[in-house]
A protein has these predicted regions:
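Glycine-rich flexible loops
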Residues: 1-218
């Protein structure tokens, strides 16, 4: 990117200078800044792992990696046509309590109260975290999580940095609610007997014994 590639726009979206046309999604960036007065910069892109979560409609789980807990607070905005005011509104409705928004079937946008580099940093943290979660969930082992007390320590740091998070003030029993992630994901291929519909004789014998006992009691 060169200096002449930069565009300057006002808060109405009118381009004031720059040789190239402004992005069609400038309205979303402006709506974020209008809704969140602390937002000095915002970044929008389509990182593959984070966008995968957005397409699946899955918010990344919490209580797993400190950097993600301290620097990011993620929510999902429903899909609307890119570049429309409707899309910008759905995203900006979430920026009071979140600084990174997954855009369903689209991508990700992040804002910062510091500068554009910091907004990009938050985007990078989310992308690395989503990739880590996908790898961990495929190892066939329970995914380790922090305790609520450990998370509270991180939230105190986060709050001191002025980063929004909807979990401030929650009780410990309301934190780290990731039950669907804790067991991990085990990918197993059915054996030949299972695919052929063959029943284990020992299991069949136990089932038959229980059935006979129940029928005897009913008689």
């Amino acid at each position: 990117m060169k200096p002449e590639d930069m565009c300057l726009v006002d808060f109405e979206g009118n381009q004031l200078c720059g040789t190239k046309k402004r992005t069609s999604e400038i309205l979303m960036h402006l709506q974020i800044m209008q809704r969140q007065p602390n937002a000095l910069a915002s970044v929008h892109c389509h990182p593959p792992y984070a966008t995968g979560f957005a397409v699946a409609g899955v918010e990344p789980p919490t209580c797993m990696v400190p950097e993600y807990e301290v620097f990011a607070s993620v929510a999902i905005a429903p899909y609307r046509t890119p570049g429309t005011p409707e899309m910008g509104k759905l995203v900006s409705d979430l920026v009071d309590k979140h600084n990174v928004i997954l855009m369903a079937n689209h991508g990700v946008v992040a804002w910062s109260h510091n500068n554009v580099e910091d907004a990009y940093f938050k985007m990078e943290i989310l992308e690395a975290y989503c990739r880590t979660i996908l790898v961990a969930s495929q190892l066939g082992k329970p995914v380790g999580t922090m305790t609520p007390t450990q998370l509270q320590d991180l939230l105190k740091i986060k709050q001191s940095l002025g980063i929004p998070d909807p979990r401030y003030g929650l009780r410990e029993c309301e934190l780290c609610d990731n039950a669907e992630w804790r067991p991990g994901v085990t990918c197993q291929v059915p054996g030949a007997a299972a695919s052929a519909g063959v029943v284990d004789p020992e299991v069949e014998s136990v089932v038959q014994a229980i059935t006979d006992q129940i029928m005897g009691q009913l008689g």
